[in-house]
């Protein structure tokens, strides 16, 4: 784990990790920049592709859904192989793999928006897929970067490095919407967006230029991580303590969510471009969303309750502070993203 890694880094080398930390925090900047930039992309795509509010919010759904699926897949593979995949790779290698995956997503975004016409729903679907790949890479990066930041020096000052990285992440969150908005709209007012799209003065080609730059930065950062002698591999004990009951619970929650959203998306089947759902369909989507929310909260609380009576097979989910922390982060991030978009 990161504590053992930090203890293994000798104190005379700790001062050499300043450059390594500077490289690492650039990754934190990317997360904030892209995630906050989606808040500008949502209303733009809503107008450009003639979407309703739910459809436009699929941008955040695809983006943050990738975080969940990436972490879940890593947990599933580690459980099946009985090996902690990230510790086996090393945090440095994990970040490099994540950056390359995000670069692939940036390339997919360039292809997705190429020649996309207003109202082209198939192009919007490809944009969602590209964002999913970008965020899937972020999922790998975040899994590795946080413990890596702690490992880059004295364990007692690990929280200081995390605070610094978090501050840089917030900087990306601050400037992301400004830069993305300037790239997309220039000086055009929001009220003129529909007219500007109709007369062709605002197109998706600007998104191409943005993601060309972002993709190149991903690759540059990956190269810096890969070939930097100042960055340790940061590998740790790859032994994996199985948590079969926790795994089954998370898979069950995921399957239920897939079923819920299958019926949500089914409401849009056969709907003409630009057409709106009727009140009955809107009401059903609201009910299904509530069921999905209950599945997450109820599943986690139920798992913790069962783990109290028999902790075997539950792993870290036997501890209430973990489950309650998961729910707190779920609530906080949900509110933060909803307000921002």
Predicted ranges, named:
Residues 71-125:
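Conserved MFS/SLC helix-loop-helix module at the cytosolic interface between two early adjacent transmembrane helices
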Residues 1-31, 47, 117-123, 309-321:
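Cytosolic juxtamembrane N-terminal segment immediately preceding the first transmembrane helix
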Residues 180-189, 212-239, 250-271, 287-308:
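C-terminal membrane-cytosol helix-exit motif in multi-pass small-molecule transporters
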Residues 57-84, 171:
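Central cavity-lining transmembrane alpha-helices of secondary-active solute carriers
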Residues 157-189, 218:
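Glycine-rich segments within core transmembrane alpha-helices of 12-TM secondary carriers
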Residues 19-51, 74, 176, 336-341:
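Extracytoplasmic
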Residues 29, 118-141, 330-331:
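Hydrophobic core of transmembrane alpha-helices in multi-pass small-molecule transporters
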Residues 38-42, 177-185, 252-288, 315-341:
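Extracytoplasmic gate region of multi-pass secondary transporters
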């Amino acid at each position: 784990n990161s504590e053992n890694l930090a203890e293994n880094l000798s104190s005379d080398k700790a001062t050499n990790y300043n450059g390594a930390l500077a490289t690492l925090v650039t990754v934190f900047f990317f997360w904030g920049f892209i995630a906050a930039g989606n808040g500008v992309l949502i209303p733009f795509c809503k107008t450009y592709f003639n979407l309703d509010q739910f459809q436009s919010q699929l941008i955040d759904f695809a983006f943050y859904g990738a975080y969940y699926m990436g972490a879940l897949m890593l947990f599933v593979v580690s459980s099946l192989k009985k090996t902690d995949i990230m510790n086996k790779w090393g945090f440095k290698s994990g970040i490099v793999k994540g950056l390359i995956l995000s670069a692939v997503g940036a390339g997919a975004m360039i292809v997705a928006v190429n020649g996309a016409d207003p109202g082209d729903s198939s192009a919007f679907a490809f944009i969602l897929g590209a964002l999913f790949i970008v965020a899937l890479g972020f999922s790998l990066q975040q899994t590795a970067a946080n413990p890596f930041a702690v490992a880059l020096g004295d364990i007692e000052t690990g929280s200081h490095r995390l605070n610094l990285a978090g501050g840089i992440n917030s900087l990306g969150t601050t400037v992301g919407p400004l830069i993305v908005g300037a790239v997309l709209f220039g000086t055009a007012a929001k009220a003129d967006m529909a007219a500007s799209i109709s007369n062709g003065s605002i197109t998706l080609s600007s998104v191409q230029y943005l993601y060309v730059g972002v993709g190149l930065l991903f690759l540059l950062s990956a190269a810096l991580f890969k070939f930097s002698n100042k960055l340790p591999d940061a590998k740790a004990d790859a032994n994996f303590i199985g948590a079969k009951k926790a795994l089954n619970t998370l898979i069950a929650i995921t399957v239920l969510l897939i079923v819920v959203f299958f019926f949500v998306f089914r409401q849009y089947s056969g709907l003409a471009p630009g057409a709106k759902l009727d009140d009955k369909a809107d009401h059903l989507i609201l009910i299904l969303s509530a069921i999905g929310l209950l599945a997450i909260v109820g599943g986690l609380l139920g798992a913790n309750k069962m783990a109290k009576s028999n902790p075997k097979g539950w792993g870290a989910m036997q501890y209430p502070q973990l489950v309650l922390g998961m729910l707190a982060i779920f609530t906080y991030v949900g509110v933060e993203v909803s307000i921002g978009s």
